[in-house]
Amino acid sequence: MGAYKYMQELWRKKQSDVMRFLLRVRCWQYRQLSGLHRAPRPTRPDKARRLGYKAKQGYVIYRIRVRRGGRKRPVPKGATYGKPVHHGVNQIKFARSLQSTAEERAGRHCGALRVLNSYWVGEDSTYKFFEVILIDPFHKAVRRDPDAQWITKAVHKHREMRGLTSAGKKSRGLGKGHKFHLTIGGSRRAAWRRRNTLQLHRYR
């Protein structure tokens, strides 16, 4: 096995003594830092490389801290107005994952960069920590790379805001196989519309 495979196996056993100690120390370290900061290198180089990271110019890693738990509806003094069925304020669950929230924050902070992907690096009772891979679309090392130049096109601006990253697609229910029948045709809405539209084809 190569070195990256050994690292992957270490990360798969998160309950081992080594990883439990390491994750506790790292979570303490991350809590002392700001909620969004640039990491000098990926904490999990094996995972980052599987997601498209390359250790060369134009690639950046940002570490994001996201508060765990549900999402309270942002209304003044709990006044939602309308019918009682929609009065919920406290026990509201956000439609997207905390990982996609981390990607969004990184994309907002680094507006000129493109979000490629992200991965989990730790969590405690209050926070989850993710590392986000960002790419500079104007760097020559990226523009001249046939494997990475797709992200330089304008259509990929702020893909994290539109649910086009891996974490975003997961929240949209997109995927292959029998578990993803609700989104055949591109989205939940497209699948619902097709199944609920009566088509009487004309006999010719």
From Swiss-Prot:
The keyword Cytoplasm applies. It is found in: Cytoplasm. Pfam families: Ribosomal_L15e. Gene3D superfamilies: Ribosomal protein l15e (3.40.1120.10). Keywords: Cytoplasm, Ribonucleoprotein, Ribosomal protein. Its main location: cytoplasm. One of its GO terms (molecular function) is structural constituent of ribosome. GO terms for cellular component: cytosolic large ribosomal subunit. The keyword Ribosomal protein applies. One of its GO terms (biological process) is cytoplasmic translation. InterPro entries: Rbsml_eL15_core_dom_sf, Ribosomal_eL15, Ribosomal_eL15_CS, Ribosomal_uL23/eL15/eS24_sf. Component of the large ribosomal subunit. Component of the large ribosomal subunit. The ribosome is a large ribonucleoprotein complex responsible for the synthesis of proteins in the cell. This is Large ribosomal subunit protein eL15. It comes from Anguilla japonica.
